[in-house]
Each structure stands twice: as C-alpha cells, then as structure tokens.
C-alpha cells in the first residue's frame, strides 16, 4: 500500500511539473486552476503524511513558473513566493486557525485585505529613490529583467516622491491591463485585421515580454504595489497596511479597494463585497488576498516551501457554461502518455473562448460517463483553465457515441499499456513513435538539457516529419547543407545550428542524464545521480538497491532508471551520442576535504565570459562555497567581470566591491 501511494505521489509530481510548464511557459494550459490546486493539495497532503518522500524537485518546493530565454535573468534576493488558496469559508477559517495555533500568545485580529489582481507579478528595485531594476517573478527564484518595459508604465514612478525613503527598497506588485484599455487595444487590433488578445491577463503578460519597449509603451498597462521585499537604510512600519500608505506617499500606487479590517467576520464581509462588485471594478480579479497585518507576526510565522503562512488567496467561485462535446482526440506526450482531449463547440466562459479541454485519462472518462455529442458543463476554475466537470444527461438525443480509448497508439500504432496502479495509458513505441520522438528531441535540446541554441520546436518537427532524424544522436550528423532544405532555413541559420550542436557536445554528466528524458529524472535527480556515481558507466550498471541510496531517489524513480538502461535501444542511443563526441568533465568529489575558498561569499557574475558558459561558471562558484546573486549591493563580496561588463561593474566600483576577472575565476577553478 505504501509503495502504491509513493508511486502515485511520483505520478502527481510528473503531472504538476507538466501542467506548470503548460501554464507558465507555453501559455497553453490544459486543466483548470481548480484541478491543479487539487493535485497540489493532494501531493502536499501525502508529503505531510510521509515527509521522507519529499524531494528537492517536488512542485511543493518551488513556485510555478519558469523564466524565458528572451530576457536577461535576475536572481531575487528574497524569493517571490506564490500564495496558498482557499475556496471556502471553512478553508479560510482553517488558515487563520493554523496561524493562531502557531502563535498562541499573539492576538491575530487585524488583516490587510485587497483584490487579487489578474496580471503579472513584478519586482521594482529602487536605489537612492531611483528605479534601477524591474523583474518578473519567474520561478520565484529567478525572473526576467524587464526594466526598460516597466519604465514605460505611467503609474510606475521612475523616482520616488517625498522624503524619508530607504536607500534601497524593493517594491512588489502586479502589472495589469484595465478593462477599458484592454477593450480599446483589441478594437484597434480588429480594425487593423490583427490578432486580438483573449483576456487582459494575457495582454499584460504579452506587453511586458516585448523585446522592443517602444511596443510596451503603446500598451495601456498599470501597476499596483502589494508588498515590500528588500529594505535597507531605514525601518518601515510594523503594520502591512501602514506600509502601503507609506509607499503611496512615495508615489507608488496601491489598489484603492485595499482595506484594513478586524476579525474574521469582517474578512468574510470584504470578500462578499468585492465578489458582488467584481464585474463593476475597472480591472479583472479572481479573488481577494488576505494578509495578517502585523509584520512581526508575519516574520515569526515565516514560510512553507512555496507560500507564506501569513497570507492566503481566497478565490472566487469558478465560472461555468454549457457546450457540446463534438469529438475526442488522443495526444501522445514525451513519455508516451496518451491524453484524451475534448474538442468542444467554442464557448465564451470566464473571459476566454474555450474549444479544447483535457479529459485526463480513461478513468476520468468513465467517472464522468461522458460521450461524444453530450452537452457538458465547462468550468474555468480560477478564471484561467477549462475543464469538463459534468454531463447534462437529460439533454441526450440517443445518437451520442461512446469514447473508445485506443488499444494502439494513434500516431505510431504500437500497442498501448497501462501499468497497474497508474491512471495513465502509455504508448510502448518509445522513439519509434513519431510523437514521442518529437517531444524527446525537443527535451534533448532544451535549455536545461543540451541547450542547443536555435534548434526550436518547429525545426525539430520538420526534421522528424521529413524523416531526417530518429534519435538525438542523428542531430549531430546534420550538415548545414542538409538543414537548408527546411522551411525558412537559410545557409547562415543552418550553419548557426550546426555550430550550436558542436558547442553542445561539451556538457556535464548531470545535463546529459537529464537530456535523455528518463521518466521522473529531472534536473535535481540528474545532479544527484552524477554526484553519487561520478560516471555514466556506474549509473548504467547500478542496481535498484544502489539507486535508492541516492538522495531523493525512491522505488519508483529507481525502477524507471534501471528500466531505461536495460532497454537495448536506449543503450544504442547513449552509445551513439558518446560516439558523436559528447563529453563532460570528471565529476568532482564533494565533501569536507574539498577546499571552499569562497565559503559564505556573495558573488556576482557580469559581462561576457569567453572560457565558460554562465551556467557552468555559476555551478563552479557554488561548488567553491559562494552564493551567486543577480545584482550588486553592499552585501556583495566579489564581482567577476567578463568582457563588456556594464552597470553592475560600475556599481561595484562605486560601492568599493572587490572586482576580479574571468582569468581570476579560472585560476580559482
């Protein structure tokens, strides 16, 4: 029973990781927020029951959301966490009870309440009153530098007003697009025959992620502050609400609906009032945020892995509509998972037109009792992601058709299998399956794997469709001349891809393991395997018993690893990759005997490094004991400056921070 539950936990992790990427990176979610939240709460409940099963790559240990490659990355000095959700008065009461139980001597009665804006979380850094950096939340630890775009937002002060502001302060808040501005933007797009945005949130996110800030400047964006991060120079009020008022005096806008209330009943009344006036408000919201007002209590309550214990988002009820289920298509993912996708009569619900919804698996189809031709209830839980929640069976006409789950893969026609205890049906074709092949190759060249610049999804799909590659090793046999037969592929672009493939041959053992796409082996697990076994050969021949000795590897993951390397076709792929020249440096022994000359030092990398990639340099510095951050401050001990170093180098010089060169870094290594 315990093994079955742990296996289910691993499946939950996989699903949560997948849907987080669909939501935060691809902007193409498959399931409603409510379903994601349910899965997350189920995962956290199992982990609470079995804390020994918690792994570093668990979704409970991080904030959803991944920084894109288009912008320079920024490391948040204090993580920008997300919020836990409540969907009922009972869950709100449980949140408050947990807080009070943790601090029995405190009287928790004052709460700062505000609408939960449906936009994009950002961080604004002011130094000596001047805006010097703006960043997205990203994954909570690392975000995107969007300073030039944020400077175009009229409600964001470029310089703080008044007096008495800290020498350094980070203000966090939400960038959003008011309803009126959104409608006007879409009206202009329609008149020009251009594509319109589906909702204000997407419009705000798309506007902030423009590489050309002149485009952002034309978009009707607004900003409201909701909290403070780093503060240096002065002490702020011990009241969260009073901090809001102080920010307002310095020229930072706050949501006018924000209130300080006393007592649980007042919190509920605030929620009911905002819900009642929701449609009349000039901006989109999907709930209210409730924060314990006392900063001292906040600090003592602290955080869980992904959210503060002193705040919660009380979400509004999901919005629902009726529509017809016209058909069901079956999609195949990288690991062979076959997912039924409902094709719906388009319906406008929760601010977007919905035409697709996931049906998850065969069990879900059976549970719903849904048939093609049924009238179904579509819900957009959290106002973001659609799902089929029920069937209106009394509207059936008698010509509805059963949904037949395929017995063979819809792409490669290999037989499908469903392992006992799993809800997912999988194609057994592996890389023989064109769908799996495409997804496996996309994973292989992705940023966190081999990181092949320029080899995007559309290029991979063409290569597979034209039968130019079958396995990852085939990529390294491509010539520029061969690549030019692809659509929109000129000689220069083709040569750039060949060059990028050659550069990617020099990697690390951890990246190589991750690139292979072994089920459940994410970045952290791959790194643990590399550190533990040191060589690929040792991992390939490791027994199940040896594998479960590795930190964060349990029975299920160990089975996936041994099964992968036991497959002859996988052995051939790995060998072919080695023969193509993929190499990595020896994995260093980690332990007290390894000197850490930078132990406890705060280090910043800036400029262009010629001998190391930025990622490799960061990893090397961390092995030497350093904490690598993304911005220079008084707390910075060393700045390693490469070629064309800019503002960070200038700031380091102004602050008197020690500056070293790339050669100094190489000497340390």
Swiss-Prot record:
The enzyme's E.C. designation: 6.5.1.2
Catalytic activity from the UniProt record: NAD(+) + (deoxyribonucleotide)n-3'-hydroxyl + 5'-phospho-(deoxyribonucleotide)m = (deoxyribonucleotide)n+m + AMP + beta-nicotinamide D-nucleotide
Residues at which Zn(2+) binds: 409, 412, 427, 433
Cofactor(s), names only, from the UniProt record: Mg(2+); Mn(2+)
Active site (UniProt): 116
Entry GO MF terms: DNA binding; DNA ligase (NAD+) activity; metal ion binding
Domain called BRCT: residue spans: 593-669
Gene Ontology terms: cellular component: cytosol
Broad enzyme group: ligase
GO biological process: DNA repair; DNA replication
HAMAP family in UniProt: DNA_ligase_A
Similarity comment: family membership: Belongs to the NAD-dependent DNA ligase family. LigA subfamily.
Role description: DNA ligase that catalyzes the formation of phosphodiester linkages between 5'-phosphoryl and 3'-hydroxyl groups in double-stranded DNA using NAD as a coenzyme and as the energy source for the reaction. It is essential for DNA replication and repair of damaged DNA.
This protein's name: DNA ligase
Organism annotation: Vibrio vulnificus (strain CMCP6)
């Amino acid at each position: 029973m315990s093994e079955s539950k742990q296996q289910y936990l691993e499946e939950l992790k996989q699903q949560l990781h997948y849907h987080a990427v669909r939501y935060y990176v691809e902007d193409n979610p498959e399931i409603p927020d409510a379903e994601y939240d349910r899965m997350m709460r189920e995962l956290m409940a199992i982990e609470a029951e079995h804390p020994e099963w918690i792994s570093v790559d668990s979704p409970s240990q991080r904030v959803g959301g991944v920084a894109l490659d288009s912008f320079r990355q920024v490391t948040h000095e204090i993580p920008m966490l997300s919020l836990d959700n409540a969907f009922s008065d009972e869950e709100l009461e449980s949140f408050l009870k947990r807080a009070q139980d943790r601090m029995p001597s405190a009287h928790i009665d004052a709460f700062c309440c505000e609408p939960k804006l449906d936009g994009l979380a950002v961080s604004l850094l002011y130094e000596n009153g001047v805006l010097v950096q703006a960043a997205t939340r990203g994954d909570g630890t690392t975000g995107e530098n969007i300073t030039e775009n944020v400077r175009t937002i009229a409600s964001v002060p470029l310089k703080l007003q008044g007096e008495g502001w800290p020498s350094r302060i980070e203000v966090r808040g939400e960038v959003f697009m008011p309803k009126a501005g959104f409608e006007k933007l879409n009206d202009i797009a329609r008149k020009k025959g251009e594509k319109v945005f589906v909702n204000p949130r997407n419009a705000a996110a798309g506007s902030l992620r423009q590489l050309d800030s002149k485009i952002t400047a034309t978009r009707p964006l607004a900003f409201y502050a909701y909290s403070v991060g780093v503060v240096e120079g002065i002490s702020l009020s011990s009241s969260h609400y009073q901090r809001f008022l102080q920010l307002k005096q310095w020229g930072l806008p706050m949501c006018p609906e924000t209130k300080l209330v006393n007592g649980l009943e007042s919190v509920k009344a605030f929620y009911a009032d905002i819900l009642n006036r929701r449609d009349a408000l000039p901006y989109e919201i999907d709930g209210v945020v409730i924060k314990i007002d006392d900063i001292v209590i906040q600090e003592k309550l602290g955080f869980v892995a992904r959210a503060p214990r002193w705040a919660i988002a009380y979400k509004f009820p999901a919005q629902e509509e009726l529509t017809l289920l016209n058909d069901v298509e079956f999609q195949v993912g990288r690991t062979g998972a076959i997912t039924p996708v409902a094709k719906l009569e388009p319906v406008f619900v929760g601010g977007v037109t919905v035409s697709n919804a996931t049906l998850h698996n065969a069990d879900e189809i059976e549970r719903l009792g849904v048939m093609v031709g049924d009238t179904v209830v579509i819900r957009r839980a959290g106002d973001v992601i659609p799902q089929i929640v029920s069937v209106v069976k009394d509207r059936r006409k008698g010509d509805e058709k059963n949904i037949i789950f395929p017995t063979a893969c819809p792409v490669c026609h290999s037989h499908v299998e469903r392992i006992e205890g799993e809800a997912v049906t999988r194609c057994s074709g592996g890389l023989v399956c064109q769908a799996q092949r495409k997804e496996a190759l996309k994973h292989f060249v992705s940023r966190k794997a081999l990181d092949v610049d320029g080899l995007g999804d559309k290029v991979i799909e063409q290569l597979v469709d034209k039968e130019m590659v079958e396995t990852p090793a085939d990529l390294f046999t491509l010539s520029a001349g061969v690549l030019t037969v692809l659509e929109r592929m000129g000689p220069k672009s083709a040569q750039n891809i060949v060059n990028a493939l050659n550069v990617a041959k020099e990697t690390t053992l951890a990246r190589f393991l991750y690139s292979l796409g072994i089920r459940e082996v994410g970045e952290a697990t791959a790194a643990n395997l590399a550190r533990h076994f040191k060589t690929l050969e040792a991992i390939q021949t490791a027994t199940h018993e040896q594998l479960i000795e590795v930190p964060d590897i349990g029975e299920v993951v160990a089975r996936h690893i041994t099964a992968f390397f036991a497959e002859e076709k996988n052995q051939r792929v790995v060998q072919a990759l080695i023969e193509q020249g993929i190499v990595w440096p020896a994995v260093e022994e980690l332990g007290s005997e390894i000197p850490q000359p930078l132990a406890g030092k705060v280090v910043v990398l800036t400029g262009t490094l010629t001998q190391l990639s930025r990622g490799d340099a960061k990893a090397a510095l961390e092995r030497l004991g350093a904490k690598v951050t993304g911005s220079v401050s008084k707390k910075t001990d060393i700045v390693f400056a490469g070629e064309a170093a800019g503002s960070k180098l200038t700031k380091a010089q102004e602050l008197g921070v020690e500056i070293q060169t790339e050669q100094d870094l190489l000497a340390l290594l």
